[in-house]
Curated annotation (Swiss-Prot):
One of its GO terms (biological process) is translation. This is Large ribosomal subunit protein bL21. Pfam families: Ribosomal_L21p. GO terms for molecular function: rRNA binding; structural constituent of ribosome. The keyword Ribonucleoprotein applies. GO terms for cellular component: cytoplasm; ribonucleoprotein complex; ribosome.
Length: 104
């Protein structure tokens, strides 16, 4: 059974494994640099360790592959019979991280 971990980043929890590429909320790190996630909620595998609320001393290390933006989401509001309408677009920024190691 391969080792996996659940980390907290960007207000979300993400399940990661070594070698996996994950998309997380934007991190202020340049492409090619290493990033360390200290908020590890669970480390699974042969012996599963569940944190209360975090696993003490556990870290997940990854390399930032790229920064980008998701596809545009368009919102449109209008009020009937009033001639009032509003169109707005939004592109959420993300960071693609390749997981290098899970240290438990």
């Amino acid at each position: 059974m391969s080792t996996y971990a659940i980390i907290k980043t960007g207000g979300k929890q993400v399940k990661v494994e070594v070698g996996q590429a994950v998309y997380v909320e934007k991190l202020n790190v340049e492409a090619g640099q290493e990033v360390t996630f200290n908020e590890v909620v669970l480390v699974g595998g042969e012996n599963t360790v569940v944190g209360t609320p975090l696993v003490a001393g556990a870290t997940v290390v990854g390399t930032v592959e790229k920064q980008g933006k998701q596809k545009k989401v368009v919102t449109y509001k209008y009020k009937p019979k009033k001639g009032s309408h509003r169109k707005q677009g939004h592109r959420q920024p993300y960071t693609k991280v390749v997981i290098n190691a899970i240290n438990a």
